[in-house]
Amino acid sequence: MAKRNAVVVTHTRLRQTGTVVAEAVSQLRVAGFEVAIIDNTEAPDFGVQPPCVSDDTEIVVVLGGDGTILRAAELVHCTQVPILGVNMGHVGFLAEFESFQIDEAIRRVSTHDYSIDERMIAHVDVWLPGATKPIEDWALNDITLERADRGKMVELSIRVDDVEMNSFGADGVIVSTPTGSTAYAFSAGGPVMWPNVKALQLIPLAAHALFARPLIIGSGSTFTIDILDDSMSEGWICCDGRRQRALPQGTRVMVRESRDTLRLARLSGVPFTNRLVSKFDLPVVGWREHARNEASSQSLHHGHTFPAAAYAAGVAVAVAGDAGVAGTDPDKPGERDGKAGA
């Protein structure tokens, strides 16, 4: 019988304070897996690829929130090993199961009862002034280029396929994948992109300009962002809220679709739309309908009343029933990582 290998990725706090990690590891071993545990969430340096899990790893099970999943993504980026997220955080957009379903998750993993969802990754080349080759990195969620000096603006020029589109002073810009469109990009006013869309979006952050709106490009195009030589501030680049470094004036940053993808294990066929409504608790009943229901609860219709509260509760139950469980997280570095990717 072939050896089956699994890796459990979690964070130190969860491993030290709870029994969930021990329970998951025990169940995987009972199912015939040899299990390695990784709880080091320290971010590698920008442009440095940390050691990946071995190619004979069958699956990486993540116990945590989306921040822990982003850490796990660094371990599988150079492999075809899928990630299964079990949400131990708050929203857990990338996770597939909730913590109380861990028994079911392990059972499904042990019987290969899951499908693979391939997610687009963004590739970034950073050309420092005078450099003959770029520093390369990548992101599952987003790449941010922000001001290094919090009291000054960073002056940027934006190009698409080598055609200049805009230039402005700003707090920075976000370049997001579809997966990251429900994270920092969403908070900054960007649109939600469905995960199967092959596109990248750029969202300016507090740009001092009359025309500074989000831009969406197709997968064959490239965003080029130059930090102008006379910029008041240097830049600061960060991939997925983890790998980061300072960028001097005159740096060029180029972002395009990566040839690689990230593989997420999916245990259900719940559509992304249901996940979006459920995780964001979207108000599917508009204010006008609420007002009508409030009015109708005060009067009788054919001898019956229809209280608005009961209606709203019914909608909530219906949404929860349709949404199933999908899977931001206190263990993420940085304030912005409280927003999950989808």
Swiss-Prot record:
Q: Does the keyword Lipid biosynthesis apply?
A: no
Enzyme Commission number, as recorded? 2.7.1.23
Recorded hits in SUPFAM superfamilies, A to Z, give: NAD kinase/diacylglycerol kinase-like
Where in the cell is the protein located?
Cytoplasm
Q: Which UniProt keywords apply?
A: ATP-binding, Cytoplasm, Kinase, NAD, NADP, Nucleotide-binding, Transferase
Which cofactor is recorded for it?
Answer: a divalent metal cation
Highest taxon, organism lineage = Bacteria
The Gene Ontology biological process annotation of the record reads:
NAD metabolic process; NADP biosynthetic process
Q: What class of enzyme is it?
A: transferase
MF terms in GO: ATP binding; metal ion binding; NAD binding; NAD+ kinase activity
Matching entries from Gene3D superfamilies are given as: Probable inorganic polyphosphate/atp-NAD kinase, domain 1, Probable inorganic polyphosphate/atp-NAD kinase, domain 2
Q: Report the function annotation for this chain.
A: Involved in the regulation of the intracellular balance of NAD and NADP, and is a key enzyme in the biosynthesis of NADP. Catalyzes specifically the phosphorylation on 2'-hydroxyl of the adenosine moiety of NAD to yield NADP.
Name the family the entry cites: Belongs to the NAD kinase family.
Please identify the protein, giving its name as recorded: NAD kinase
Originating species: Bifidobacterium longum (strain NCC 2705)
